[in-house]
């Protein structure tokens, strides 16, 4: 009897711990999906009791970033020679270029793995400055059609409408196809990213997150009535086409889909006087982004995350207040009677009046980029990434 028990014990250790299909999540969009939060801004998470637990999941006690053994990622990164960065999830899968950056992928991967409690794979395809109306335009949306105002402007400038249409056609859908190409390449060789991939069990496309929008929102040529009711209806229609086409092309008809609704600047209801001129544009665009979730075919399988809810109002106000220092510096620069030392002292005194030491610390560690990149804040993008994972879990 004893030899049989030993044999059974040995067999049990040879069975893969995870016999389910590998869950694969697709993260797609433009610069905010890339992520422009410098690694140093992670410190800000620890300054808020609500986000401190996220930092513990990201860093070890010594402050060094953890490598997450059960989360694997393949990410487009044009700053490296191969054009792709892949491996186990850690910091550094944000936008390429200067310094280590993070995007929503970090806390998304951490949170999603906690939800499913098994290894997962992330495939991230994002490029800065790309629109849905042209760059990511899905096949079923048809060709880009110039509106009457655009045609009129071409005629006024003596430009060839025929050439403009040819040029637009060349650009149309390029990044939709690149997204598919990279995704299908990874899915065809998962073991090159995740060495322990069980080919017998295969994979499951378990979720898609779309975080894009800025280039469409600011495009007054494509959306000439922007800010008025219904002015971004074309975006809603294109996004619905996008969801359908992605599901068709990836042979995943019920692929759970999260729309990350643009929210840089925070809730519109909290906009101060200086931001009111943007309120109608931001408001109408956010409505248009979320609109597909109301379609009957998407009920229960497409949801929206309003990223405005994770905007840091305190951090934003501190950044706005810092603008007064820059204005003061320009004012002092005009006074030729002051020495350099006197100007520096005047700025230091002015800063001390404007900020407490704690506020200066928050400002120092909390931001690394502009407002349209969510202030380059790991705290904001960290909460957004977690929200994406939580939202997917609810519909999958």
Regions found by a protein language model. Give the residues of each.
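Bacterial N-terminal signal peptides
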Residues: 5-16
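Cell-envelope and extracellular/periplasmic
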Residues: 20-396
């Amino acid at each position: 009897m004893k030899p049989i028990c030993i044999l059974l014990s040995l067999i049990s250790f040879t069975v893969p711990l995870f016999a389910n299909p590998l869950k694969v999540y697709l993260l797609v969009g433009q610069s905010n999906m890339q992520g422009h939060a410098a690694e140093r801004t992670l410190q800000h998470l620890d300054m808020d009791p609500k986000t401190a637990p996220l930092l513990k999941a990201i860093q070890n006690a010594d402050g060094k970033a953890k490598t997450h053994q059960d989360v694997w990622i393949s990410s487009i990164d044009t700053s490296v020679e191969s054009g792709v960065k892949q491996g186990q999830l850690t910091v550094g899968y944000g936008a390429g270029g200067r310094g280590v950056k993070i995007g929503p992928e970090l806390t998304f991967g951490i949170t999603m793995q906690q939800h499913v409690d098994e290894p997962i794979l992330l495939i991230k395809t994002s490029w800065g400055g790309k629109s849905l109306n042209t760059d990511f335009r899905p096949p079923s949306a048809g060709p880009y059609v110039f509106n009457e105002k655009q045609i009129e402007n071409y005629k006024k400038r003596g430009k060839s409408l025929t050439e403009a249409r040819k040029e637009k056609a060349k650009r149309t859908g390029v990044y939709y196809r690149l997204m598919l190409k990279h995704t299908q390449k990874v899915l065809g060789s998962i073991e090159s990213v995740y060495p322990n991939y069980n080919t017998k069990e295969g994979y499951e496309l378990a979720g898609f997150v779309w975080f894009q929008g800025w280039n469409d929102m600011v495009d007054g040529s494509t959306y000439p009535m922007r800010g008025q009711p219904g002015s971004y209806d074309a975006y809603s229609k294109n996004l619905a086409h996008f969801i359908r086409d992605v599901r068709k092309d990836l042979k995943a008809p019920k692929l759970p889909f999260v729309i990350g609704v643009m929210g840089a600047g925070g809730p519109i209801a909290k906009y101060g006087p200086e931001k009111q001129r943007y309120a109608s544009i931001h408001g109408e665009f956010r409505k248009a982004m979320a609109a597909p979730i109301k379609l009957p075919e998407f009920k229960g399988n497409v949801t929206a995350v309003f990223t405005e809810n994770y905007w840091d109002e305190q951090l934003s106000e501190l950044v706005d207040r810092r603008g007064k220092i820059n204005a003061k510096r320009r004012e002092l620069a005009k006074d030729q009677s002051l020495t350099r030392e006197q100007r520096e002292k005047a700025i230091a005194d002015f800063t001390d009046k404007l900020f407490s030491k704690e506020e200066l610390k928050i400002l120092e560690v909390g931001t690394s980029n502009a407002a349209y990149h969510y202030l380059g804040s790991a705290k904001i993008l960290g909460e957004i990434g977690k929200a994406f994972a939580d939202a997917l879990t609810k519909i999958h």
